[in-house]
């Protein structure tokens, strides 16, 4: 782990000042810089442009070397706006890649791509920094044991379980509960696994980033009184940033997560919102660097760039990074190269359904569309696998019967189908769950449900033992015992009304 001042800091040491170049050309966020013969910087080195513009405003722009062009000239991509830069300006080669602060001091704080805090809470209290470019862990360091990452969320753990150290795609439109699900996962990993989370906001709306920060403070995921008690570090490179920043902000977040895994030996959750924007930024940079575009205008290095990021997200013998990535599918075309390349890396998909959200069933995870490579009897065990399959079959049959019910009504169904519908409606409601982070809004206390409890509950519903209970008893409860207790309370209330 490198211990040095971050390249983004205002001070660049006297040693680094020896290697000076000057700007020869500026095209948008891309700079060509000329260095003295024999003093060429390496690829990925950070360059710093300092000076004043025409109205004497201070300029401090960090760039990253992308190409060595020959004739002592390099091409670099700026990590912030290039407004005010001029030809002939002095450029300092820092002699190292971009480095960002890591460790416990990053929790509860918001950073930009350079690792600079942007939350007005003062400097970060750490001297430990780490370069954002590093190779993926070697094969010998990897933990190859397949194990489930228990989230405490019934619908996820039963029907589309997450792999420890795996990658999960999160699909869903606006307003179906992505943010609340993300915050609940951050909360549960801290409580159940003693782990921390890193959130990488890649090329999304600034307003959404601000909303997430405010909601995290409200729900206690970020502790304002004692910032060190927070459970998450935030790294933002939003839509208005140059493509260089959006392309590298995912690596900044990943570097912070790697420190928690490798040095603190913790289980880490890494959220990337949105992985498509990472690809999009790479495509913009690729065009600016003059590379020939590939299919649909994407960069020719699309698979390599995606692989470089994704291969660093894994389980090692020290700890694990489990990544949840929001995936935007352009024009709902799953064959588009960006989502298609992402799918190759995913172990599970969690699909959020607007129909379920409209019914008031939260989390609105679609039990039939969500998938996981972990749902195999040899991994999760026969009991879990059988229960999950029977739940899916019951829900699928209910879905097929809905058209008949809408036209002819329930009475026209056979006795067997009516029983299936009744159980499916109970299952649908039992898949809902009160969240800890939503206590503020719902007023009902959150519930963490262990996997064994989840399986027991669904087995009881499928066996028919609970057929006599009303379906509203299963809505927004934790384990099955709470559902039976709720049914007793409902019965008592009904008797009192009579």
Curated annotation (Swiss-Prot):
Its EC number is 7.1.2.2. Keywords: ATP synthesis, ATP-binding, CF(1), Chloroplast, Hydrogen ion transport, Ion transport, Membrane, Nucleotide-binding, Plastid, Thylakoid, Translocase, Transport. Gene3D superfamilies: 2.40.10.170, Bovine Mitochondrial F1-atpase, Atp Synthase Beta Chain, Chain D, domain 3, P-loop containing nucleotide triphosphate hydrolases. The keyword Transmembrane does not apply. It is a peripheral membrane protein. Its main location: plastid. Belongs to the ATPase alpha/beta chains family. This is ATP synthase subunit beta, chloroplastic. The gene is atpB.
């Amino acid at each position: 782990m490198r211990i040095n001042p971050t390249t983004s800091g205002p001070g660049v040491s006297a040693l680094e000042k020896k290697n000076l170049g000057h700007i020869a050309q500026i095209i948008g966020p891309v700079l060509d810089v000329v260095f003295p013969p024999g003093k060429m910087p390496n690829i990925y080195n950070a360059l710093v442009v300092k000076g004043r513009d025409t109205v004497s405003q201070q300029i401090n722009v960090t760039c990253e070397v992308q190409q060595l062009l020959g004739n002592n000239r390099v091409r670099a991509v700026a990590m912030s706006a290039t407004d005010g830069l001029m030809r002939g300006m002095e450029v300092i080669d820092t002699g190292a890649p971009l480095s960002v602060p890591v460790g416990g001091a990053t929790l509860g704080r918001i950073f930009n791509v350079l690792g600079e805090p942007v939350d007005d809470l003062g400097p970060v209290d750490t001297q430990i920094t780490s370069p954002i470019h590093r190779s993926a862990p070697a094969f010998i360091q990897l933990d190859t044991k397949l194990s489930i990452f228990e989230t405490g969320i019934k619908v996820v753990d039963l029907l589309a379980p997450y792999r420890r150290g795996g990658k999960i795609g999160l699909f869903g439109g606006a307003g179906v509960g992505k943010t609340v699900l993300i915050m609940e996962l951050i909360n549960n990993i801290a409580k159940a696994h003693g782990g921390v989370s890193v959130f990488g906001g890649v090329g999304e709306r600034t307003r959404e980033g601000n909303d997430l920060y405010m909601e995290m403070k409200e729900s206690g995921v970020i502790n304002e009184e004692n910032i060190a008690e927070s459970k998450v570090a935030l790294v933002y490179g939003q839509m208005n940033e140059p493509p260089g920043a959006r392309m590298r902000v995912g690596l900044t977040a990943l570097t912070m997560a790697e420190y928690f895994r490798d040095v603190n030996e913790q289980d880490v959750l890494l959220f990337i919102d949105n992985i498509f924007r990472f690809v999009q930024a790479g495509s913009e940079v690729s065009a600016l660097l003059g590379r020939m575009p590939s299919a649909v205008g994407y960069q020719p290095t699309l698979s390599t760039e995606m692989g470089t990021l994704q291969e660093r997200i894994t389980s090692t013998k020290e700890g694990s990074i489990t990544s949840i990535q929001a995936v935007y599918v352009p024009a709902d075309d799953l064959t588009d190269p960006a989502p298609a390349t992402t799918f190759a890396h995913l172990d599970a998909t969690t699909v959020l359904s607007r129909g379920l959200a409209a019914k008031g069933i939260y989390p609105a995870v679609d039990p039939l569309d969500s998938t996981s490579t972990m749902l195999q009897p040899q991994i999760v065990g026969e009991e879990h696998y059988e229960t999950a399959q029977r739940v899916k079959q019951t829900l699928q049959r209910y879905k097929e019967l809905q058209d008949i019910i809408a036209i002819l009504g329930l009475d026209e169904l056979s006795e067997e189908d009516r029983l299936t519908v009744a159980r499916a409606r109970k299952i649908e409601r039992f898949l809902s769950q009160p969240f800890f982070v939503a206590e503020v809004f719902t007023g009902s206390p959150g519930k963490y449900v262990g996997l064994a409890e989840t399986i027991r509950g669904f087995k009881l519903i499928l066996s028919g033992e609970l057929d006599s209970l009303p379906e509203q008893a299963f809505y927004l409860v934790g384990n099955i015992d709470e559902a039976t207790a709720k049914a007793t309370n409902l019965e008592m209330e009904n008797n009192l009304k009579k």
